[in-house]
Structures are given as structure tokens and as C-alpha cells.
Amino acid sequence: IAEGLEKLRSRVLIFCYQLSHICSGKSHIQKSLAVWKPELERYTGLVQQIKAKSKERKTLVAEKKELPIYHVKRHKALAVRIAELTEDLEELRFEKALLLQKFEYAEDAGAEAFRKDIATMEACLKKLETREQKYSVELDKALTEYAELKAQAADFDPVELYKARQVIRPAQEKAAEQQLEDAMHEKPSLIMLLSAKQETSHLLGADAEERQARQLIMHRNQEQYRNSLSKRKRNDPER
């Protein structure tokens, strides 16, 4: 029973860690998407402005070239507007270059570069959500099995069961950590592992069990001490 409970506890621990890891990955991707998507819109807007202003400038330059020289007033107006457009285009192109540099894209990269990265992130997010659903189902299953086995252990001495589980636990936890490392191809994060252990204890009600076992141990120790003291008094009437 003790070994079965500890094996199930290890399964719960693994699922808690994996779900926490998935949650962290989802959060990172969602934050990235919250940046990439608005910046794609901004990039698209810059490209459209550059295209529109370039077309307008080209049209005005052609008009100025064909305009008779004696239309002085119109020539001046065209020159002013062309200068404004030239300045606007320089600023827009500079802003576009900075935006591409921010995301480490090549200077000739287009909106497709943004869309490709966004699509990749969204695909990763979908995969994580699928895995999250799978591990949530597995976690619920492990919790149900744990509750059923715990009910079977109701007739066992809680102190002896607690002590037996404490002996088994270190090896089971080590095996769980190795299983995580094998599955994820990296050592588990100590912080996330600690968090997963706390979540496991919470889900299994381990804190209450431990308090109960410790109280029983203390009570029995006190009983043994009182019995021992009483026995010594009976054996030594003069005292």
C-alpha cells in the first residue's frame, strides 16, 4: 500500500511539473504574440504609408518636370510638397528599419517574416494547449486512483504507513526527476520542482496527513513515557 501510494504521488508530481512547465511556455508565447501582432500591424501601416507617399512624390516630380517654367507659383508649391514627402519618406523608412532591427530581421524582410514567426508561435501554443489537456486528464486519473488506494489503507496503522512512505519517498522522487529529465531532455528546474511538490502536497492533502501522523507519534511517545515512568514507580516503592 505504501509503495503504491508513493508511486501514485510521483505520477501526480510529474504531471504537476509538466503542467507548470506548459503554463510557463504558454505565458511566454502569449506575451510574445502580444508584441508581434501589434508590430505586424504597425509594419504593414508603415509599408502602406511609404507606398502611398512614394507614389504621390513620383507623380508630383513628373508633374513638376512637365510643368512650363513660367508657372512659378505652382513650381514652388510642388517643390515644397516634394520636399515634405521626401522628409516623410526618410522618417518612415528609418522607422521601418528600426522595427526590422528590433526583431533581428533582414533589411529586405517583408510582412511575411512577421507572419511566419506569428504562425510558428501560434502552432506551438496550440501544441502546448493539447498537451495541457492531455496531462490534466492524466492528473485527474492519478488523483482518483490515489483516493481509491488511500481508502483501502484506512484500516492500516497511520503512523506505520506514514513511516513506510517516508522511507520509500526519496527513491520515488529521484525516479520522477529522472523521468522528467528523460522526457524533456534537460534537468528539471529546481524552483518549478519545488512548486510542483507543493502543488502535489496540496492536491493529495499531504499536509493534513503529516500533521495527523506526527500528532499520533507524539501522543504514543508520551504514552510510552508515562507507562515507563509508572512502571518504574511500581518497581521502586520507596520512590
Regions found by a protein language model. Name each.
Residues 1-239:
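Extended intrinsically disordered terminal tails
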